[in-house]
Amino acid sequence: MSGVSTSTTTSFDHKQLAGRIAALAAGRAGLIMFAVALLTSASLLFSVQPLFAKMVLPHLGGSPSVWAVAMCFFQAALLAGYCYAHALNRFAPAWLAPIVHLVVCAAAALMLPFALPEWASEPSSGNTYLWLVSVLAVGVGLPFFATSANAPLLQAWFSRSGHPHASDPYFLYGASNLGSLVSLLSYPFLIEPMFGLDTQRAIWAIGFGMLMLMLGGCAVLMLSSQKSFAARGAATVADTAAKAITLRDRLVWIGLAFIPSALLVAFTTHITTDIASAPFLWVIPLATFLGTF
C-alpha cells in the first residue's frame, strides 16, 4: 500500500508541476502579446504623424505652420482617444469593450491605406488652417483616434486578465514609450530615406492589420480568464475611490500638462521657421519630449 501511495503522490506532483509550468508559459506568452501590441500601436501612432504631415506639406508650399497645426490636431485626437478609452473602461462591461473597440478599428481599417481626400485641392488663401485640419480629420482622423486609445485600453485589459502582474499593469507603459521613441527616431534616418510615401502608407496599413489581430488575441486572453469579472469589480471599486479627487486637483493636473505641450509646439515652430520645415526637425523635439516621461 505504501508503494501505491508513493506512486500516486509522485504522479500527482508531476501533474501539478506540469500544470504550473503550463500556466507560467501561458502567462509569459500573454505578457509578451500585450507588450508587443502596445509597442506596435505606439510605433504606428507616432510614425503616422510625420508621414501624413509630409503628404500635406507640398500643398502648402512647405510652410512651417504645417507641423505646428498637425501637432495640435494630433494632440487633440490623442486626448479624444484617451477619453474614449476611459469611457469604455469605466462604463462598458468587460465583454463589450473589446467588441466596441475592434468595430472602431475595423471602421478605421476601411480607410487604409490613408490618402488625401479627393476634394483636397490647393487651399484658398485665408482658409489654410481650416483646410489643413479638415484634411487631417478626414484623411487620418479615425485611424489615429483608434490607435491612440490602445495604450489605456490594453493596460486595462491586462489588469483584468488574471496574470500574476495584473494588479500593476503600468509597467507596460515602458513598451509603449519604447515603440514611440524608436518610431520617431527611425523615421528621418531610416524610413523616410528608404521608402517612398506610397510604400510607407502600405506598410502602415499592414501594421494596423497586424495590430488588430493582436488586439483580438489580447481580448481573448482577457475574456477567457476566470478572474476577468472579479477584476472588473475591483476596477469599479477603484473608480469609486477615485471620485474623492477634487475638481481643483483635476484642473491643476490639466494646467500642468498643458505647459510642456504648449512649449513643445512653440519650440518646434520656432526651429522649423528659422531653419527648415522637415521631418527631422519635426520629430527630434517630440522624441525629446517623450524621453522625459
How does the language model describe each region?
Residues S2-F293:
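Alpha-helical transmembrane segments of multi-pass membrane proteins
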